[in-house]
Amino acid sequence: MSFSAKVKGEICRYIDISKEEALAQISAIMKVCGTLAFSGRQISFKMTTENPASARLMFTILKDYFDIHAKLMVKKSNSLKKNNIYMVVVTEEMGVKKLLEITGILREIDGIMSLDYHIDENLVDTEEKKKAYIRGAFIGGGSISNPEKTYHLEFVTHSQEYAEDLGKLINTFGLKAKVIQRKNSYIVYIKEGEQIVDLLNIIGAHTALLELENIRIMKEMRNNVNRLVNCETANLSKTVNAAVRQVESIKLIEREIGLARLPKNLREVAELRLTYPEESLKELGEMLEPPVGKSGVNHRLRKIEKIAEELRTGNF
């Protein structure tokens, strides 16, 4: 089961809501996955989904809250996945006109009915109704990627005006949803992991939220370990390269003028580095008598490298 299906399965069990919340929720579902059909003077409305839990919820809300006994149909998809497609249909005899009016989908102006692509503010004038609306939008047209791979949550809509309204509604909760066009659709999306967690909390997907949080924590721990390993590897590589360079410089001095020509403090460090090419500066310093700190050893080795460079260029 995909992570999207898990989220939808969870929030579709969220049915202990008021009639006002149910109205907000079914309005959002109808806006994002519904189509209006005309046959002569008759109209009908169809909601389409591949998720059986979503279809069941649509049917239940209409029956329990609005006394509408919708028609539930199932057919095979023509896509390669061969999933079932579930359709919840409300006809004129079932009271579709009244439903379209109270959900803010149809609006009558001067006796003429027209489609309203905006979100009716009366449907989302409380925080709970806003949450119910966003939950409905996810049930009807939302999806979330596998958090093991990437963080991405989106709502697919078919109107720019509606997508912008939905984005603004989501952002009233302090989120940063954005809108883009993808072919003939308008996508409201969130890509930041922490914000996706917040949105799951808003729509009531608490089990999915905890699963995502656990994945985020594990990914962060793995990333921290990888950064630490990479950092230590880089430091080790830097240390090894420095040691190799120091040994080469000391051997050059030994070959050209002999280590005996070096001052005692430099000669002692040079001899130790030749004998212990893999030891750290701190460990070399502890072998000296009296012991010398890491910075002191580093200073002496830099002087040795400078002498070697002068020998290479003939300036010694």
From Swiss-Prot:
GO terms for molecular function: DNA binding; endonuclease activity. Gene3D superfamilies: Homing endonucleases (3.10.28.10). PANTHER family: CELL DIVISION PROTEIN WHIA-RELATED. InterPro entries: Homing_endonucl (IPR027434), Intein_endonuc_central (IPR004042), Sporu_reg_WhiA_N_dom (IPR018478), Sporulation_regulator_WhiA (IPR003802), Sporulation_regulator_WhiA_C (IPR023054), WhiA_LAGLIDADG_dom (IPR039518). Transmembrane segments: none annotated. GO terms for biological process: cell division; regulation of sporulation. HAMAP family: HTH_type_WhiA. Residues 280-313 bind DNA. It comes from Clostridium perfringens (strain SM101 / Type A). Keywords: Cell cycle, Cell division, DNA-binding. This is Probable cell division protein WhiA. It comes from the Bacteria. Involved in cell division and chromosome segregation. SUPFAM superfamilies: Homing endonucleases. Belongs to the WhiA family.
